[in-house]
Regions:
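Glycine-/small-residue-enriched transmembrane alpha-helix faces in small-molecule transporters
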Residues: 1-55, 61, 160-187, 208, ...
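Transmembrane alpha-helices of multi-pass small-molecule transport proteins
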Residues: 2-7, 45-95, 122-126, 176-184, ...
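Juxtamembrane helix-entry segments on the extracytoplasmic side of multipass membrane proteins
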Residues: 17-22, 46-55, 77-83, 155-177, ...
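Helix-helix packing/entry segments at the starts of transmembrane helices
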Residues: 25, 29, 55-56, 93, ...
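Specific transmembrane alpha-helical segments of multi-pass solute transporters/efflux pumps
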Residues: 31-36, 66-116, 152, 236-254
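Membrane-interface helix-cap regions at the ends of transmembrane helices
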Residues: 34, 38-41, 45, 60-79, ...
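Hydrophobic/aromatic residues within transmembrane alpha-helices
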Residues: 42, 53, 57, 103, ...
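Hydrophobic transmembrane alpha-helices of multi-pass small-molecule transport proteins
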Residues: 65, 86, 118, 126, ...
Length: 359
């Protein structure tokens, strides 16, 4: 009986998973919200080239990641996990930083928020395609409304699109790259661990990023100011490493599609930081748009919290009963098993509870 009761207890799991995922996701978004304004500062006035900012910050983060992996003696990823880590590295270590760094030499932080506001919707779509998560209809309504509100107020704040320009194409590419990396990284975080996922992605891309950093310095010597170096330090330590620890942990707790919608708040925070650090105007219409985006993001997340699914019982997604999978043995025990037993057969032979308790 002791073995039975201890195996069937599930303390705090549903509450922890449904609340912890969005909380970690919000922490990651708060860290990322400074990335665009600080990148704009680093590439301003030619103090650092966009190639150096994008590649060298990955080198800084790789040093932290490699140290953490060595100190904790993490096992190496296996087989196809390396390929999936390549997707993460291509998206958030190389693709997003490079594309946004070059775009921000030609446009403002406020204008960049126009396209980056599409990232949550892109992540949600790729998460649904990549996994078997099926959000309720209310989630999609809230997500779509939030995306429209985010793009609408960001376009108005940034002065709108004067046709499709080169910086916009770079930012669209950055959104696609980051969304693919977020979706794949969220799944890998369930297998490798949240901080291990971004750490191995950084290590995998380190040789390429180091070469690009050297090329960037040779092509354009560094003449950065102290403020630019401070901004670069944040990009390397927080935006490239610590922020992903929180973000991938949130995606691992999941569900991924709902947690991704917390990013709808990021353009609001980004424009706030742009107003504070870069002197960009923050109007009443921007404040009202920010409230609309936050309300929609909260509504999307609450659709998950209000109706827990089997995935909520496992913080890292283990034990989820997927479509077409075989139910656990305990579901077919008892009366169901006795119906198929021969008359007079002993009942205890059809009770698999002790075996299933070990699972």
């Amino acid at each position: 009986m002791k073995e039975h009761s201890s195996a069937t207890r599930q303390p705090r799991a549903p509450l922890s998973s449904t609340r912890t995922g969005p909380a970690w996701g919000l922490l990651g978004v708060a860290a990322f919200s400074l990335t665009v304004p600080l990148t704009r500062i680093t590439v301003a006035e030619g103090g650092m080239s966009p190639l150096f900012v994008a590649s060298a910050r990955a080198v800084v983060a790789t040093f932290l990641a490699a140290t953490a992996l060595l100190v904790t003696r993490q096992p190496l990823p296996r087989g196809r996990q390396w390929i999936r880590l390549g997707v993460v590295a291509a998206g958030v270590v190389a693709g997003f930083p490079l594309l946004t760094s070059f775009a921000l030499t030609m446009t403002s932080a406020g204008h960049s928020a126009v396209v980056i506001a599409l990232l949550p919707a892109a992540t949600a779509v790729l998460a649904v395609l990549r996994t078997e998560e099926r959000p309720p209809r209310a989630f999609w309504w809230a997500a779509a409304t939030g995306a429209v509100a985010a793009v609408g107020f960001a376009v108005f704040h940034g002065g709108g699109f004067a046709g499709l320009q080169w910086p916009d194409l770079l930012l669209f590419g950055a959104v696609v790259a980051a969304a693919a990396a977020y979706a794949e990284g969220g799944l890998l975080a369930r297998e490798l661990g949240p901080w291990q996922t971004i750490s191995w992605a950084l290590v995998l891309s380190a040789p390429l990023m180091a070469v690009l950093s050297g090329i960037a310095v040779a092509a354009q010597p560094l003449t950065a100011s102290p403020a630019q170096w401070a901004s670069f330090a944040y990009l390397g330590v927080v935006s490239m490493f610590l922020g992903f620890l929180a973000w991938y942990r949130g995606l691992a707790y999941g569900p991924m599609a709902q947690v991704s919608q917390i990013q709808l708040v990021q353009p609001v925070l980004t424009l706030g930081w742009a107003a504070l650090l870069l002197g960009e105007s923050l109007t009443l219409s921007t404040a009202l748009g920010a409230l609309a985006v936050i309300a929609c993001a909260g509504g999307a997340v609450r659709t998950r919290l209000a109706r827990p699914t089997p995935d909520a019982a496992s913080p890292l997604g283990s034990g989820v009963l997927r479509r077409g999978s075989v139910p656990p043995p305990e579901r077919v025990s008892g009366a169901t098993a006795r119906r198929g037993a021969a008359p007079g057969a002993p009942e205890q032979r059809s009770d698999p509870a002790p075996a299933s308790a070990d699972r």
